[in-house]
Swiss-Prot record:
Enzyme class per UniProt: isomerase
Protein name listed in UniProt: tRNA pseudouridine synthase A
NCBIfam families tied to this protein: hisT_truA
Its EC number(s): 5.4.99.12
A Pfam family that the UniProt record links to this protein: PseudoU_synth_1
Matching HAMAP family: TruA
Active site positions: 57 (nucleophile)
Function field: Formation of pseudouridine at positions 38, 39 and 40 in the anticodon stem and loop of transfer RNAs.
InterPro entries: PsdUridine_synth_cat_dom_sf, PsdUridine_synth_TruA, PsdUridine_synth_TruA_a/b_dom, PsdUridine_synth_TruA_C, TruA/RsuA/RluB/E/F_N
Catalytic activity: uridine(38/39/40) in tRNA = pseudouridine(38/39/40) in tRNA
Entry annotated with the keyword Cytoplasm: no
GO molecular function, one term: RNA binding
Organism: Polynucleobacter necessarius subsp. necessarius (strain STIR1)
Taxonomic lineage of the native organism: Bacteria, Pseudomonadati, Pseudomonadota, Betaproteobacteria, Burkholderiales
Amino acid sequence: MRIALGLQYDGSPYSGWQTQVNHNTVQNELEKAISAFVGEQACVVKPINTITAGRTDTGVHALGQVVHFDTNVEREDFSWVRGVNSFLSSSIVINWAKPVSEEFCARFSAYEREYIYALHAGPCRSPMAHSRAGYLMLPPSQWFDIEAMQKSAECLIGEHDFSSFRSSECQSKTPIKTIYLIEIISKQPWLYFRIRGNAFLHHMIRNLVGCFLQIGQGKQTSQWMAEVLAAKNRQIAAPTFMADGLYLAKITYPQEFAIPQPWLKSSWLPAQVIGK
């Protein structure tokens, strides 16, 4: 049978999602926990291999990650939640579990993904935001030009070649992606970016955030974003911004799979950011 799980995690202790030899990853920890719960004998018959909706990078967090795996073990839905959580560290939690059809794939059945980037900006870092938000030093009297940033985002909506925002390590078969929404929310000294699309390239969100911040500080004009997009050249875009503030917030699937909504309100992010 196929089981889908919804999970949240603090990505700061991990070297990203994907299994790596001699590295602590979310996938490693999750598969060990599931294997411990189902038992050694069941794993010999059918080893636990998880498929995820989004392979987050080192330090990136998740509020609404979705995975699936196949197993011969049958349990009640809440038994999966309680049982697997008992083998997980406090930085990872399963919120829900449910059996799904063999047609469901956590990765390929998804048609929308939404990320949130949280930034703290000001003259001093906040220790309370350590690893939970990005940081940019700004003088006390300075703030971002939100209107210029939002205007620069207009050229990104729709289907485009996002090669200028793609890392050299990206394994995607195509740089063509579709962005449906970009919203920039200012709550000084906090700044939030909500970006929704069908899929994203490696480092794409962090590279976009880096460009937005250049525009917001007046170092580039709002027209610069369109120039970067059209160039299809990573070298002319802003440097990749830090991972700390990036959250995989939500994965959307066709209604036929009845995948539960993520528990966004359990996060520290304000309702204005997550409540839409």
